[in-house]
């Protein structure tokens, strides 16, 4: 299995900054926003977007962590580790994840969100969209579109979890 770095730390930081600017441009009422990171790396990505929003707009955007395992149709959950202490009813929720692939994680995340309240709308921000959707899911904010083969895997590394920032592609030999 060969691994190759396709995005370095600087390019990754720029992609996150671009996503943040797009969120600002497309949302007139930033005070209605709630960021919800999908565990695990989506949480770190959402925190970085939250920090950039604070730097750029001076707003402290509410933040939560969503565990999609209890809502998956293909995986068994040990326990729900969701941490969302915010009333999302009437809010503009931005779900944040590292990679969008089949759409199944996002479907599970939406199921989790509607159990918590009735947001005004739900948007999706992803660092990488690699294609191959199995469900009609589309990201509103995309850092990088990286078309892949089904025999390839995108690996997002984030310093908070992996010790460095990069995006790798792993190919089966």
From Swiss-Prot:
Residues that bind substrate: 40-41, 97-105, 130
Pfam families, per database record: Pribosyltran (PF00156)
Q: Does the keyword NADP apply?
A: no
Motif residue range(s): PRPP-binding: 93-105
Molecular function in Gene Ontology: RNA binding; uracil phosphoribosyltransferase activity
This protein's UniProt keywords: RNA-binding, Transcription, Transcription regulation, Transcription termination
Q: Which InterPro entries match?
A: PRibTrfase_dom, PRTase-like, PyrR, PyrR_bifunctional
Keyword NAD among record annotations: no
BP-aspect Gene Ontology terms: DNA-templated transcription termination
Disulphide-bridged cysteine pairs: none
What is stated as this protein's family in its record? Belongs to the purine/pyrimidine phosphoribosyltransferase family. PyrR subfamily.
Q: What does this protein do?
A: Regulates transcriptional attenuation of the pyrimidine nucleotide (pyr) operon in response to exogenous pyrimidines, probably by binding to specific sites on pyr mRNA. This probably disrupts an antiterminator hairpin in the RNA and favors formation of a downstream transcription terminator, leading to a reduced expression of downstream genes.
The protein, known as = Pyrimidine operon regulatory protein
Q: Name the gene behind this protein.
A: pyrR
């Amino acid at each position: 299995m060969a691994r190759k770095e396709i995005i370095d730390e600087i390019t990754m930081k720029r992609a996150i900054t671009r996503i943040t600017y797009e969120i600002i441009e497309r949302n007139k009422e930033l005070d209605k926003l709630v960021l919800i990171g999908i565990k695990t790396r989506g949480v770190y990505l959402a925190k970085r977007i939250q920090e950039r929003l604070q730097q750029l707009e001076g707003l402290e955007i509410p933040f939560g962590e969503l565990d999609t395992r209890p809502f998956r149709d293909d995986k068994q959950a040990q326990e729900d580790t969701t941490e969302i202490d915010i009333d999302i009813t009437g809010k503009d929720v931005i779900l944040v994840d590292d990679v969008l692939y089949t759409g199944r994680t996002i479907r599970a995340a939406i199921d989790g969100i509607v159990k918590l309240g009735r947001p005004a709308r739900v948007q999706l921000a992803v660092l990488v969209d690699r294609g191959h959707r199995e469900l009609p899911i589309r990201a509103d904010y995309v850092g990088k579109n990286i078309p892949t083969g089904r025999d390839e895997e995108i690996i997002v590394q984030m310093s908070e979890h992996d010790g460095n920032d990069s995006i790798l592609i792993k190919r089966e030999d």
